[in-house]
Amino acid sequence: MNDVAELKEFAVTHARAQNIAGYRDVLARVDNDEDGAEGSWAIEWTRAGAALEERGKHLEAAQCYNMGRFPFVDGPARSDALRRCVAAFDRWRGPGIERIAVDGGQVRGWAAGLSAAKPRPLLLITGGIVSIKEQWAPILSAVTRLGMAGVVTEMPGVGENSLPYTPDSWRMLSTVLDAVAGRADVSRTYALALSFSGHLAMRCALDDPRIRAVVTAGAPVRGFFTDRAWLRTVPRLTMDTLAHLTRTGRDDVAGQLDKWALTDEQLRALEIPVYYMKSARDEIIPPAEAELVRSRVREAHLLEHDDTHGSPGHITETRLWSVWAVLHARRALPAQRLALGAALRLLRARPPRR
């Protein structure tokens, strides 16, 4: 059972990222996190999703169901919310988005723009430890407009991914590339990997030259995994989620994380550009992680927001910067890059949303 106040605090970033209308009304109705109870987190969000689904608003329903299973499935109510989320997204998606299954179905994803006749460069999209593929898959139509194929998948243990999260989980990304190699030009893969999946993408790029760039936001690098004093300040929800994903006891997870840390040698060995968005007041990721990237990675591009984890007050700016970063790494669509750069400068001149 999660702390309701902490759930509500974390929910704001994800609700804003999905443009969920009326999310504050749903949060106001939540007063507990007991599985299946009236007024509980999963029940209230599932009820909101069902009401939208009855009106034929399948994407909006999927977004509410996604919030209902947040941060991870820990009982029947959240399991039902996840099942409904995937089903609602499946009903919403058009013919241009297809379902994929990898590694015997242990890894699942949504894809667009795959073609054996005309394989395109691939944008591989992954969320962090609490965000599922259905949260990010709606952007696939925009990916194809950039002249790329896109695959959205999940970190191990997240959503429908049944793998455990281990120090070797980066290999999963290579497995996904292998699975679509016949229908995408995976030799030109660009990873848009948020938060903890950014760490996976950087580690994978050391061994898999098909990854040509990593665009990330608030990714752990070393300090998060090794600094016990910092870990004691990390929100309980984050540590509980990591314990769930790693299949480790809550009291033992901190002692296991040092195996994930990237060394100076590994960071210096990265021969690809890394685009890293830092939140200056991040309550999860230590501030020194961005400095490690800047000082060790050969080609590092940093963007900093005066904000908390995920920069909920800078969502539009982060989205534009992420698209710009992918195009910059590809050296593609120069006119669009210039337009994005101009839009970013205008946004950065405005006060942040609080």
Regions found by a protein language model. Give the residues of each.
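Catalytic histidine neighborhood in serine/cysteine hydrolases
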Residues: 295-312
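Catalytic histidine-centered segment of alpha/beta-hydrolase-like enzymes
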Residues: 72, 307-319, 337-341
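Conserved alpha/beta-hydrolase
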Residues: 143-160
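N-terminal cap/lid segment of alpha/beta-hydrolase-fold proteins
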Residues: 45, 72-116
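Short alpha-helix in the alpha/beta-hydrolase fold that links the catalytic acid
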Residues: 272, 286-295, 306
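Short beta-strand/loop motif that positions the catalytic acidic residue
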Residues: 269-271, 276-278
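Alpha/beta-hydrolase active-site loop
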Residues: 135, 163-184, 190, 203
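Hydrolase active-site cap/lid region
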Residues: 203-255, 272
